[in-house]
């Protein structure tokens, strides 16, 4: 195994978690998405940021912090001015840290265009891919993305109108909220929505099969925008650093515990990368719903994927989290090392409902079902002297019926969402059979 921790970080070279594919450049890793051996790309080494960066982090803006982090990841491959522009364009919105209760803060990741944390990765990746395509003079790159809800809207809106790129969003029929669906089925232009007769796992399988199909790849230039793509998940590290900066400003930076509602594991992986770069986080908590594959792994040391089950925290309904391979790789496959830095929790729909209801009643803070898992895990697991931050990954209005049903009150819908709701849905039906999907793509 090649060590992930080296004195120099240069993502110019990425290797695959399966260790069978040749080492790739950043550009190849971003354009291809998945390695030839079906593994996920990992940076060759991770460079800690200097101590003076952490000493002065509370004086820097979100964009300044993000640029320093992006430079450590991508700086050797992208000219400084271009990278700065990509970062500043991506972060056109704030990610405030809001106090909910004693020693527990919400990192609100829902102030972007589609009101979900994936706006950060989606916008960054769209701009980075756009840059590489222009640089190569390429035409017509096709982005395939499977979504259980928020990824589709964030990626579609991130890429909307980006020249030379067409996005195909695959989503499970009837398993995505109307608000989520409207955010990627009403856009038109270079975005096509495919309504798959199956589950999210079926959608993800179609995307992965397409990448592995030789004939398709000879016919079309394909890439992925799921968190399997390094350009999607690495930028998510930005807001962990910014959360720390805000804690520091509040005089609460010691013994920080970060809790991440976890589905496909891209989000927590980005946080773990931050820790490897020296970010002073004491420990992480991965909060699962009933799809508690990771929680079971922590308990038993065995990774046993299983079909996902539907819950009210639908973005976390993942039965075989892709990024688990990255977590394993980051810790050299050691269950003991993983357990030392990450603990897990698992909650039922009933417990999630209870948490949303009580937090609204006691603190007048409205959680979405995913954030509720994060908040509850901190309520249950924070130790004396620790400060907890949970990631509030999407605006509660994106889960309108669920949230209104729980609190028994109307939830105000942000103007951005109201705009989407006015649009007309346009999608193409698709079977979960790869042969049909392939036929469709070959006809493009």
Regions found by a protein language model. Give the residues of each.
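Active-site/ligand-binding loops adjacent to catalytic centers
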Residues: 180-228, 232, 285-373, 406-444
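Domain-scale recognition of functional cores that engage charged ligands
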Residues: 205, 209, 218-275, 279
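Small-residue-rich anion-binding loops in enzyme active sites
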Residues: 39-115, 187-217
């Amino acid at each position: 195994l090649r060590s992930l921790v080296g004195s120099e970080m240069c993502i110019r070279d990425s290797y695959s978690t399966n260790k069978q594919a040749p080492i790739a450049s950043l550009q190849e890793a971003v354009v291809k998405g998945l390695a030839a051996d079906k593994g996920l790309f990992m940076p060759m080494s991770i460079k800690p940021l200097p101590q003076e960066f952490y000493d002065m982090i509370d004086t820097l803006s979100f964009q300044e912090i993000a640029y320093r982090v992006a430079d450590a990841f991508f700086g050797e491959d992208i000219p400084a001015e271009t990278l700065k522009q990509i970062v500043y364009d991506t972060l056109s919105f704030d990610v405030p840290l809001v106090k909910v209760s004693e020693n527990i803060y919400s990192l609100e990741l829902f102030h972007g265009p589609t009101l979900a944390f994936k706006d950060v990765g989606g916008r960054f990746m769209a701009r980075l891919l756009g840059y590489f395509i222009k640089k190569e003079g390429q035409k017509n790159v096709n982005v395939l993305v499977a979504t259980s809800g928020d990824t589709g809207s964030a990626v579609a809106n991130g890429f909307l109108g980006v020249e030379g790129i067409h996005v195909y969003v695959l989503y499970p029929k009837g398993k995505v909220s109307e608000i989520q669906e409207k955010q990627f089925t009403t856009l038109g232009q270079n975005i096509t929505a495919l309504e798959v007769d199956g589950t999210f796992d079926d959608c993800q399988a179609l995307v992965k099969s397409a990448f592995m199909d030789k004939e398709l790849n000879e016919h079309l230039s394909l890439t992925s925008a799921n968190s399997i793509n390094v350009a999607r998940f690495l930028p998510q590290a930005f807001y962990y650093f910014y959360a720390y900066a805000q804690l520091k400003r509040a005089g609460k930076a010691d013994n920080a515990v970060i809790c991440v509602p976890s589905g496909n594991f891209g989000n927590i992986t980005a946080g773990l990368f931050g820790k490897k770069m020296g970010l002073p986080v004491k420990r992480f908590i991965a909060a699962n719903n009933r799809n508690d594959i990771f929680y079971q792994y922590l308990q038993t040391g065995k990774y046993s994927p299983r079909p996902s089950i539907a819950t009210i925290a639908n973005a976390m309904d993942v039965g075989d989290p892709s990024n688990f391979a990255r977590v394993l790789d980051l810790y050299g496959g050691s269950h003991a090392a993983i357990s030392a830095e990450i603990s897990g929790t698992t909650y039922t729909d009933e417990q999630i409902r209870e948490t949303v209801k009580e937090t609204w009643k006691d603190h007048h803070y409205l959680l979405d079902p995913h954030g509720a898992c994060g908040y509850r895990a901190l309520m249950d697991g924070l130790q004396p002297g620790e400060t907890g931050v949970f990631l509030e990954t999407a605006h509660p209005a994106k889960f309108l019926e669920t949230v209104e049903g729980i609190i028994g009150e109307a939830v105000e819908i942000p103007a951005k969402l109201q705009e989407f709701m006015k649009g007309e849905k346009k999608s193409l039906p698709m079977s979960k059979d790869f042969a049909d999907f392939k036929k469709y793509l070959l006809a493009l």
